[in-house]
Regions:
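A polyanion-binding, active-site-adjacent surface
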Residues: 1-156
Length: 156
């Protein structure tokens, strides 16, 4: 579960079709997770953005925007009944868990809610893309793959 659509996702009407989606696809493959077995969605259903010239840049959603999308998120989870949800980023984790969390403080731990028996928190693929250097990006990718492997093992 991502945080919110990005520019390309907003235009396409499909989550994870932009650069972060490519990072996620590569990480899923490296973790041995078949894309066909994964349901991708976002916690916040609209793209909040700020204009920068001709570009639309991501802006962090407010708590009220996260809460406004709760009914859709709860409906998705109640219908899908996933065994595991991987929250990509702190905004997605807050939406699923109903409280503020940090990726660093919760990565690697199995959490739960009344709708999902196992919740994992990891970095959003866009954070990997924004890393300052190649070594940081490689470290971020390796952590994402490890987190996805852990979640996949729990789903079995």
């Amino acid at each position: 579960m991502g945080e919110q659509p990005g520019d390309q996702e907003d235009r396409a009407g499909t989550p994870f079709v932009g650069p972060a989606g490519r990072v996620l696809e590569e990480a899923l493959a490296a973790a041995g997770v078949e894309r066909a077995h994964v349901y991708l969605t976002n916690a916040v259903k609209h793209f909040k953005w700020e204009p920068r010239g001709k570009r639309r840049l991501h802006a962090k959603p407010r708590l009220s925007e996260i809460q406004a999308c709760e009914p859709w998120l709860e409906l998705e989870l109640s219908r899908l009944r996933p065994r595991v949800v991987v929250c990509l980023g702190a905004t997605a984790a807050r939406a699923v868990l109903g409280r503020p969390v940090t990726v660093a403080g919760h990565r690697g731990r199995v959490l739960s809610t009344n709708l999902v028996p196992a919740v994992f928190v990891t970095a959003h693929p866009s954070a990997i893309l924004r890393a300052s250097d190649a070594a940081s990006r490689a470290r971020g990718r390796a952590q994402l793959v490890a987190d996805l492997r852990q979640a996949a093992a729990r789903a079995l």
